[in-house]
Amino acid sequence: MSDIEQERWSRVKGRLRSTVGEDIYSSWFARMDLESVHGESVRMSVPTRFLKSWIQAHYAERVLACWQAELPDVHRIDLMVRSAMRCAAPAKEAPAADPRRPEHGDGRASTELKMVATAPASANHDALGGSPLDPRLTFASFVTGRSNTLAHAAARQVAEGRRGDSIMFNPLYIHAGVGLGKTHLLQAVTWAGNAGTERKVLYLTAEKFMYGFVAALKSQTALAFKEALRGIDVLVIDDLQFLQGKSTQAEFCHTLNALIDAGRQVVVAADRPPSDLESLDDRVRSRLAGGLVVEMGSLGEELRLGILKSRIEVARAHHASFSVPEPVLDYLAKAITHNGRDLEGAINRLLAHSKLNAQPVTLEMAEREVRDLIRPQEPRRIKIEDIQRVVARQYNVSRSDLLSSRRTANVVRPRQVAMYLAKTLTLRSLPEIGRRFGGRDHTTVLHAVRKIEALVSKDTTLSDEVELLKRQLQE
């Protein structure tokens, strides 16, 4: 860009900022760049499709007016997505504006914001208009095992769907701990879904959703924000546990309902099941639980070994001589049990040490380099449903009895024991425990906890029963 064009662009941006206001400018125009000026046509770019669509729908005439104040002969704006420009073959020059272009009633040329030739959206995450995508996180690089087979199969089915197909799982809700592959699956769905041009698949973190909604509220463009989201064919939301704020949650709930009711697919991931998302509104949890809820469990040794081998193959694509002996692989698979990120980190460390020091990978090197990645085995995470099931079996009652309003002695005591265990073995709050036991008040739970605490200190039989239940739940 020449100095003259740069000066013109600075003046146009100043006019635009004055026209729309600082908040709107910062939200929607701060990342817009000038690419070129050709006669009557100005070519500009934005980083995402979402941003392009928004500007095209709501600010086209204002953008054109700002340019015409600087260059009266400009009658056309070509707005493109930068990532598509980088990935596509060079586009042909924009044709000169048609002198017969349609006019408004006052004789002004109609505003034209046109998207020129672009590559498929899968070419780069920016073209999706959502949160950044890692090009490594595809189905091809996802390693399957017993703990993630169902989640993988469900995600593949979503990704391979076509517009108009009947939807089997909606929403698809995947939950897992940190580093177990849920983000990998969600991004794989997005890459695969956007590989063609038929469907619009948008990947957003909960944080990005919140930011977009709050920015729309501040700029008084909330309606456009809602319309844009509800025009998506597949909405993919990651890290839902971070969704905060009543108004944001309400908007997410409305969006969720609108998309599902319209036959659009929704895929969600979080670090816990819907019932454990205490900060979310009951309506949101209920709608999420109404779809397919899939847990991705901890990585078994065989799966950990598969992940290690996969990461080594990736490393060898750039470092052909890199090799990890089988004894080292076995050691890593047995010793690093926490999550897949630690396994990838271990391979990266061995690669760096081997290449930088020009030494082969040995078991001694591995033991030294990954020492801090070997963590104590975490205790099994206990769920309230597990407690209810084990207690019901122990006392020969049904789980529905524990949740009911029955006050008979053979039900009251097991219910109190289950509430006591829920308080001592989980991180759930008293109100949440009460809700999970038939919608009881938190004072009822507190009474049950104190009652059992007092009894186990005096009643050895009950104390033994409670200890037995704890062992069964922790095994």
From Swiss-Prot:
PROSITE patterns: DNAA (PS01008). The keyword Methyltransferase does not apply. One of its GO terms (cellular component) is cytoplasm. It is found in: Cytoplasm. One of its GO terms (molecular function) is DNA replication origin binding. Residues 73-131 are annotated as: Domain II. Residues 1-73 are annotated as: Domain I, interacts with DnaA modulators. ATP binds at residues 179, 181-183. Belongs to the DnaA family. It comes from Nitrobacter hamburgensis (strain DSM 10229 / NCIMB 13809 / X14). It holds the Pfam family DnaA_N. PANTHER family: CHROMOSOMAL REPLICATION INITIATOR PROTEIN DNAA. The keyword RNA-binding does not apply. It comes from the Bacteria. Domain I is involved in oligomerization and binding regulators, domain II is flexibile and of varying length in different bacteria, domain III forms the AAA+ region, while domain IV binds dsDNA. This is Chromosomal replication initiator protein DnaA.
